Amino acid sequence: FCKVRAEEKITEEMIQDPTLLGYFVDNELPWRKDALVRYLSLDKSDINFQKTLEWTAEEKGLDVESINMDTLKAGLTDEDQSKFLKHIADKYFGIVSKLLKERDPNHLFLGSRLHGQAIRLKPVFEVLGDYADVISINYYHRWTPRISELENWRMWSGDKPFVISEWYVKGEDSGYTNTDGAGGVVKTQVDRGRFYQNFTLGLLESKSCIGWFWHTYRDTKDLPKGSNKGFLSVRYKPF
C-alpha cells in the first residue's frame, strides 16, 4: 500500500524539484501512551488485537492460547507500554521512510506532524530520530514555547532537528467566530503580531529548531463564520 501510494503521490516533477523541501507522511497520528492496552482491548477478530497479543506473549514468555486477558492487562507495566509504543512506531516509520526514500532520494522525510499527547512521548521521538531527517511538530496550547519540551525533543531524538509544522493564533477583531481549530484567541491583530514575535523568539532558544510554518496563508471560510488563521483575509487582504 505504501509503495503504491508513494508512486501515485510523488511525481517525477516533484522528485526533480529543487524548491521542494520534503514530505510529511501523515498528520497528527493518534500516538498514545496506553496504546498496548487499547490494542489488547480490541475485538479478538481484529488483526491488530491478534498481532499485539502475539507480541505481548513473546515479550513476556507466555503461551497465547492460555492467556487470561484480564490478568494480562492488569499486569502491564509502564515499561511494557513504552516498549510496545516504540515497536509500532518503528514498524510504521521504518516502512514509510524506506519507501519514501526509494521513491525520492532527493528530498527530506519530515515526519508525521506530531500533535497533542504525541509531543510528550519519548519512544516516538527515539524512533523518529532513527528515520526522519527533520521531526515535524504541530505545537499548540502554548503562549510561549516551553524550553523543557524543546530540550526533551532534542535529547529523545538524538539531536535530530525539528520544525514547527503548524501553529497560529486568532484575533477577535477579525469579525470571525473563531470557534474552530486548536489556535488560541487574542484581542487584536497587533496582539497576534506580539504573539508571533514572542513565540518565534522562544523557538530560537533551541538550537535544534530549524524553522516554523504558520498554519494557513489566508483565513478560512467567510464572514461571519470562519477563523482568523491566516496572514491574509479570505479576500487576500493583509490585516
PLM regions: where:
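Alpha-helix termination/capping residues and helix-transition junctions
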Residues: 14-17, 129, 206-207
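Short, solvent-exposed loop/turn and secondary-structure capping segments
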Residues: 33-38, 147-148, 174-176, 224-225
